[in-house]
Design a protein with these regions (language model features):
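Transmembrane helix-loop-helix hairpins at membrane boundaries of multipass inner-membrane proteins
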Residues: 1-59, 138-149
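Hydrophobic transmembrane alpha-helices and their helix-loop junctions in integral membrane proteins
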Residues: 43-47, 66-78, 91-293
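Short hydrophobic alpha-helical membrane-embedded segments
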Residues: 54-63, 253-257
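Short, ordered loop/turn segments at secondary-structure junctions
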Residues: 82
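Short phosphate-coordinating micro-motif centered on Lys-Gly-acidic
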Residues: 85
């Protein structure tokens, strides 16, 4: 069952075929609950840290939380993209302003990866939008149902699948799109690292289930072995690197890559038990990672 909140409809969005529609399903309930519980715990755990310009710091943290909540509840692809950026952009400023000595290099790498992923996703979103059926107020629509039923050829679905998957794989991250993560985690302030590792990586996993599986089922079947292979390589590689780390943040980064690889591989098995396991793993991983601090 879905609970929809559609009390706000901006006319400019409506004429683009987009409505500000938020909803909750089983997966959304779990991740919004995790986000709602995690942030107060993070604030309590790091309350002894004296941040310069603390009001701006906590304001950006709360903006990140708002973006995460929106990602997990958006029932419209354009609204989803808006909240995706709303979650990512404050994280960049948190790391670049309040991070460690090498924060500039780390956040530059973070910016390049996330900007590339966002650009690829935006291209895919526009292409999908142009192939949706007309809505009541616009020629095309960004609504979930319209996107799910977009009229695309098999070849089009294949290359758009990769646009979305690379964008989501960068955020998870999945090997070989992971190289931004260890440096960013190490240089970011502890509270930001807790958000990045405990919650934000779930954005990519959630997005694969929410958008890729329903929109590109044939492409998922065609490329599942490639994705599972990359995920398994990432699991083994990251696990071996993690056990050699003497820095907690880098250990968390590499161990998260291994956990996310397991989740991604499970998703692409396309089995019900695999998806159920991913949902449990997402929640438990978030609790465990945040609890480590």
């Amino acid at each position: 069952k879905h609970f929809y909140l559609n009390n706000v409809s901006y006319f400019w969005l409506r004429y683009l075929g987009s409505n500000f529609t938020l909803g909750l399903d089983g997966m959304g309930h779990m991740l919004t609950a995790l986000t709602a519980v995690a942030f107060p715990i993070i604030f309590i755990a790091t309350n002894k840290t004296n941040y310069k310009n603390a009001n701006a710091f906590y304001g950006l943290m709360l903006l990140t939380q708002s973006g995460l909540m929106g990602v997990f509840t958006a029932m419209d692809l354009l609204v989803f993209y808006f909240f995706w950026e709303l979650a990512v952009i404050p994280a960049y400023f948190l790391s670049s302003r309040w991070g460690g000595e090498r924060r500039i290099q780390a956040t530059f790498k973070f910016f390049v990866y996330t900007f590339t992923g966002s650009l690829l996703m935006l291209v895919g979103i526009i292409y999908l939008y142009m192939h949706t059926i007309p809505s009541a107020n616009a020629e095309h629509s960004f609504s979930m149902n319209a996107v799910y039923s977009a009229v695309l050829s098999p070849a089009e679905k294949n290359w758009i699948f990769w646009l979305f998957f690379i964008a989501f794989a960068i955020k998870m991250p999945v090997f070989p799109f992971h190289t931004w993560q260890p440096d960013t985690y190490e240089q970011a302030p502890t509270s930001t690292t807790m958000v990045l590792s405990g919650i934000m990586v779930k954005m990519g996993v959630f997005a694969v289930i929410r958008w890729i599986l329903p929109v590109f089922p044939d492409a998922v079947t065609k490329f599942d072995n490639i994705v599972i292979g990359l995920s398994v390589i990432g699991m083994i590689y990251a696990s071996l690197i993690a056990i050699r780390q003497d820095d907690l943040k880098r250990f968390v980064a590499y161990s998260s890559i291994a956990h996310i690889g397991l989740m991604c591989a499970a998703i692409f098995t396309k089995s019900e038990i695999g998806l159920q396991g991913v949902m449990i793993q997402m929640f438990s991983h978030g609790i465990n990672i945040i609890g480590m601090w």
